[in-house]
Amino acid sequence: MGGPVTTSARTHVVPTESLPREAAVWMARALQDTLATQRRVSLALSGGGTPGPAYRALAAQVLPWERVDVYFVDERFVPPDHADSNYRMVEDTLLRPLRLSPSQVFRMEGEREDRAAAARDYAAKLPPVLDVVLLGMGEDGHTASLFPGHPALEETEQRVLAVVGPKPPPWRMTLTLPVLRSARRVLTLVSGAGKQDTVRRAQAGDLSLPAARVTNSEWMLDPSAAGR
């Protein structure tokens, strides 16, 4: 199959089987572009089923990985070796294959009992501006752990919050919209026909959908999500 078809300056429609590779190429180029002008680059990653294969493909990209610092967009309040841990998924697909130094990985500490303190401590670890961010989107339009109708969507001061989500395990830690909207490069990666209507609404600017509020994001979709 061919490469991505760019339908607008901000939306890329990619064959389903090529989605992981094309997302990895997008991230690698964004990292390289940033490293051309600064010594280190920050990369913030999401959990979910769609990003995992993209991280495996990213691990195969030739980059000066010793100059990349890895952060997390959100995390469940579970231990790092738990099956539901975003850290565990990223560790399995990207961190372990690359053998990144622990000093380059800034994990959200989901095992902590004081959730508010864990969120505050993570906010203190974040750089002033994230360079490259990969997001996903659920069928309900949530992104990171920012859910429709949740008060966290209106947060303007705190950079990281502990929130309760609609699915178990309910407690999550998440970056807030000001952090996501200030990032230099953002990609929202979506696949599947079940998300087609939500993608359409988000791209039309339906601000009841958290993903629509990340107005600086590019989108990478497979044909099903794009309605093709």
Predicted regions and their residues:
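SAM-dependent methyltransferases
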Residues: G2-R10, V14, R21-A23, A28, ...
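Conserved phosphate- and dinucleotide-binding cores of soluble alpha/beta proteins
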Residues: L19, V78-R228
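N-terminal active-site beta-alpha-beta segment that forms phosphate/nucleotide-binding
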Residues: T6-A118, P128
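Short, compositionally biased "basic patch" segments
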Residues: M1-S8, D140, L146-F147
